[in-house]
Amino acid sequence: MMGSFIFLLSIIISINYINSLHTVHRSNIHRNMHNGGMPKKAVAVLKSDTVNGIIYFQQNNRASATTIYGTINGLTPGLHGFHIHQYGIKANGCTSAAAHYNPFEKTHGRPTNNIKHIGDLRNIKAGADGVANVNIISNHIQLSGPLSVIGRSLVVHANPDDLGKGNGDAREESLKTGNAGSRIVCSIIGIAPST
């Protein structure tokens, strides 16, 4: 009887100790965030059967632009729509990312326009070797705060993005997706080490 009591007591003490470590870790994260700390770098690791790449997001402070850079391999040569989508991906792949990240409910457009989705980046161009070198500077992508893109998805599309300029029958879809076609590779955007 006494042995069972001591065993149970040791389990309770262990659980309390682990919970206290978790609480200290969480409070350190929150303290750093409230003291002006923020993630300065994020990463999306893109991988499918044929396409792979790593894209980094770097923002030095909340007021600075975000640089989006990296390389994607295995694309068909030419332009491809490149967007941040609303949700992180689930088991059913890129379709679970939902629509472009658009918290202000605007129509799709060119990244330099006032009317655009926050998730509208631009087209990326793959060379004849299927490699796209990405280097984008964005004033509307944030790594912290209520408009943070961390936890959302980065998606590469099969076709070029028409930047909301489609005409005729293509106009309605142009204002939603840029007629960029199917989603060929995607990744959740996660926090990366700053170094």
UniProtKB/Swiss-Prot annotation:
InterPro entries: SOD-like_Cu/Zn_dom_sf, SOD_Cu/Zn_/chaperone, SOD_Cu/Zn_BS, SOD_Cu_Zn_dom. It is found in: Secreted, Extracellular space. Destroys radicals which are normally produced within the cells and which are toxic to biological systems. May act in the parasite defense by neutralizing superoxide generated by activated leukocytes, thus acting as both an antioxidant and an anti-inflammatory factor. Keywords: Antioxidant, Copper, Disulfide bond, Metal-binding, Oxidoreductase, Secreted, Signal, Zinc. Residues 1-38 form the signal peptide. It catalyses: 2 superoxide + 2 H(+) = H2O2 + O2. Binds 1 copper ion per subunit. Binds 1 zinc ion per subunit. One of its GO terms (molecular function) is superoxide dismutase activity. Its EC number is 1.15.1.1. Belongs to the Cu-Zn superoxide dismutase family. Zn(2+) binds at H100, H108, H117, D120. Its cofactor is Cu cation; Zn(2+). This is Extracellular superoxide dismutase [Cu-Zn]. Cu cation binds at H83, H85, H100, H157. Pfam families: Sod_Cu. Disulfide bonds join C94-C186. The keyword Protein biosynthesis does not apply. GO terms for cellular component: extracellular region.
